[in-house]
């Protein structure tokens, strides 16, 4: 919100055009092309889709696109437990401006939903789930261990929502789900905190194949995470 205010001030001072990051139909149309790629991939249809919510632009556009092709898909919006402005607003029937917003997942730290995104999410998002920072850290760890990818906290939020519902038994084994993981702007200073919260200190064995270019031979090395 503070960034948006500063951007508005800059555009007025310098005669620029302000492009809203989520509360704009053209912006949302562009974000929705992500879902077009999913549909055109031929991997569907899917039963569930998990999308992180900040201002709501990505969730609204993805939900709109998916339901056009797969009307029965269930779209689950995922918010941080101390960032749930959209969930709170829909529960209260009006746009709510939160007094406090946690900024660990800084890419989704929004005090109040957009004027355009709020009614769209109310209409198109079927369910909302909130996740803790620790659950987000666990999701980042899962991404690293499975794909060697490190998403930013906001980018991993949707995966945290899926894992939470999966662990609760709310996702049926036969259901086909996809998760939107968007964002790799990791603050390097967060890595230690994420590793600590995700329990990286567990004693687990990993195998790494390294190549010695001096002796031109490969060595198998057993790594222990401590």
Residue ranges: model-predicted function:
Residues 1-213, 226:
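PLP-dependent amino-acid enzyme catalytic core
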Residues 214-221:
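Conserved small/polar residues in nucleotide/adenosyl-binding loops
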């Amino acid at each position: 919100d503070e960034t948006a205010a500063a951007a508005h001030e800059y555009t007025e001072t310098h005669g620029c055009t302000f492009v809203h990051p989520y509360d704009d139909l053209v912006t949302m149309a562009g974000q929705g092309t992500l879902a077009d790629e999913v549909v055109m991939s031929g991997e569907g249809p899917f039963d569930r889709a998990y999308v992180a919510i900040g201002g709501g632009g990505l969730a609204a556009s993805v939900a709109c696109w998916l339901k056009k092709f797969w009307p029965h898909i269930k779209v689950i919006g995922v918010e941080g437990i101390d960032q749930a402005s959209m969930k709170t607003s829909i529960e209260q029937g009006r746009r709510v401006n939160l007094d406090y917003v946690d900024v660990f997942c800084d890419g989704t730290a929004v005090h109040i939903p957009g004027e355009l995104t709020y009614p769209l999410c109310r209409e198109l998002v079927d369910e909302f789930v909130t996740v803790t920072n620790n659950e987000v850290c666990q999701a980042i760890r899962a991404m690293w261990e499975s794909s060697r990818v490190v998403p930013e906290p906001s980018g991993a939020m949707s995966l945290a929502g899926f894992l939470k519902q999966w662990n609760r038994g709310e996702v049926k084994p036969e259901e086909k789900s996809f998760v939107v993981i968007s964002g790799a702007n990791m603050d390097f200073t967060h890595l230690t905190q994420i590793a600590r919260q995700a329990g990286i200190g567990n004693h687990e064995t990993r195998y790494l194949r390294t190549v010695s270019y001096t002796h031109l031979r490969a060595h198998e090395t057993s790594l222990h995470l401590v």
